[in-house]
UniProtKB/Swiss-Prot annotation:
Oligomeric and partner information: Part of the 50S ribosomal subunit.
PANTHER family listed in its UniProt record: 50S/60S RIBOSOMAL PROTEIN L16 (PTHR12220), LARGE RIBOSOMAL SUBUNIT PROTEIN UL16M (PTHR12220:SF13)
Cystine connections: none
Localization, UniProt: Plastid, Cyanelle
Organism encoding this protein: Cyanophora paradoxa
Protein name per the record: Large ribosomal subunit protein uL16c
Primary gene name: rpl16
InterPro entries tied to this protein: Ribosomal_uL16 (IPR047873), Ribosomal_uL16_bact-type (IPR000114), Ribosomal_uL16_CS (IPR020798), Ribosomal_uL16_dom (IPR016180), Ribosomal_uL16_sf (IPR036920)
Record GO terms (molecular function): rRNA binding; structural constituent of ribosome
Record-linked SUPFAM superfamilies: Ribosomal protein L16p/L10e
GO cellular component: cyanelle; ribonucleoprotein complex; ribosome
Annotated signal sequence range: none
Recorded family membership: Belongs to the universal ribosomal protein uL16 family.
GO biological process: translation
Length: 136
């Protein structure tokens, strides 16, 4: 699963997801892509599950690029712990995804195959997505 090797700070504040994605919102590497339509935190497990689903469907046919990286730590307190005594330990990593952000790109496969692979991958993600193509 994806996670940063090292970070400047162990814990982060939650922040908020306002507006649309101004960066990473068009295709760069592949011919087809999966674009987010809603804001969400996508965990490294969800990214890995969708990557595996795409790989399983495409087999050795195409090349896949993951355009998001989980670089935000989410902390959790142990169950049944009293209030106070600081912030919990980092539990998992998430990628902040805003509407318009390209999540995956794929190359070397037909449009029908790419569409079907991304459809399977979408079921693993907590957001609505849309299929985009660089071909006109």
């Amino acid at each position: 699963m994806l996670s940063p090797r090292r970070t400047k700070f162990r814990k982060q504040q939650r922040g908020r997801m306002k507006g649309i994605s101004t960066r990473g919102n068009n295709l760069v590497f592949g011919d087809f892509g999966l674009q987010a339509l809603e804001p969400a935190w996508i965990t490294s497990r969800q990214i890995e599950a969708s990557r595996r689903a795409i790989n399983r469907y495409v087999r050795r046919g195409g090349k896949i690029w993951i355009r998001i990286f989980p670089d935000k730590p989410v902390t959790m307190r142990p169950a049944e712990t009293r209030m106070g005594s600081g912030k919990g330990a980092p539990e998992y990593w998430v990628a902040i995804v805003k509407p318009g952000r390209v999540i995956f790109e794929i190359n070397g496969v037909s449009q029908e195959m790419a569409k079907a692979a991304f459809r399977i991958a979408t079921f693993k993600l907590p957001i609505k997505t849309k299929f985009i193509s660089s071909r006109v």
